[in-house]
Amino acid sequence: MAQITNFFLGANSGSGFQNLFSEIMDPETAFDIMILKGGPGVGKNTFMREIGRTMEQAGADVEYLWCSGDPDSLDGVVIPMLRCAVCDGTSPHAVEPKYPAAVDRYVDLGRFYDLPAAKAQAVEVKRHTHDYQDAYGRAYHCLKAARQVELDTVAEVSRSFDCQRAARRFSGIMARELRGRGSGTGKITRRFLGSLTHRGPVWRFDSVEALCPKVYELEDSYEQAGPLLAALCGEATRRDYDVTACPSTEEPGRLEHLLIPELGVAFVTSKPGMVYPGKPYRRVRLDALSHPENKARLRFRARMTGVLREEGIAALQEAKAAHDLLEGVYNPYVDFEGVRAQAALEAGRLLSWMK
């Protein structure tokens, strides 16, 4: 039975749009990467769903990569066994071929627009485009303000965090879980586990459980787990275990979750707004290792951060509504049968490579 996993390549944050699209698949080892071009409402999601559905039915594992602007829409699909992928290559993702045709290639869905009809809608298209771009600007202003308040809290808590005690605890975990050598090459695949969206925070912990039945839950409200997870990641890859490293959506250089599928072990961060819903194998209470002095001030900052993030989410909802209107303008003038036929052609090509 095909194994299905779900992640994100993009995320909304206090620093704007965070982008891992260049890491969808390493072009040095990939066989085929389709980069979809075409504007709003042209059927990129339809195309990718068709590819994913066909490969699932053929028994291949499929990784779905969801959109932070609309977590019900796809930004990409990966077929690991074929070393193949397809992704949305339009703004803000801006994916371009590195080895054109030999490895990665464009698939132009823009040709399925009815050009004269679309040009007749230019006024509406421009209005809705400006509306959703303005809404994203407001969202990122609010999220930036929320992040600044949050960083003050993190800095204050960090001063009282018992780093040595945390390191000892993780050293014991590392000794128990990382034994022997893996069968991989120590490859690191980076994915966001979720994102802040117009529906609020969306986290795909289902993928953690699909890949790793043993889960260590790290209670970490103040961003102290990053160096500990980095050490685990380094030791795992040194021992040739392939890992999926899920960075923070606010700081992609800092790890929040680490999955080691060959061992069936995962380490996930749990905090307000990102609570692990399952039953962990073990819970590591990092919050208990810090002793900030002014807890009332921390609670006030937490409320302020929450209010500002809610304003950001409201703006993301406005952006989603404006983008839906924009797609609604285009949809009547898209040849969706042509899009599906192109998807079927490409899916057939993928199936031929399975033989």
Please provide the spans of the model-predicted regions.
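An accessory alpha-helical subdomain
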Residues: E124-E177, R297-F300, M304-A343
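Conserved nucleotide-sensing/catalytic segment adjacent to the nucleotide-binding pocket
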Residues: A2-Q18, D32, R53-A117, E124, ...
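GST-like fold's C-terminal all-alpha helical module
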Residues: G348-K355
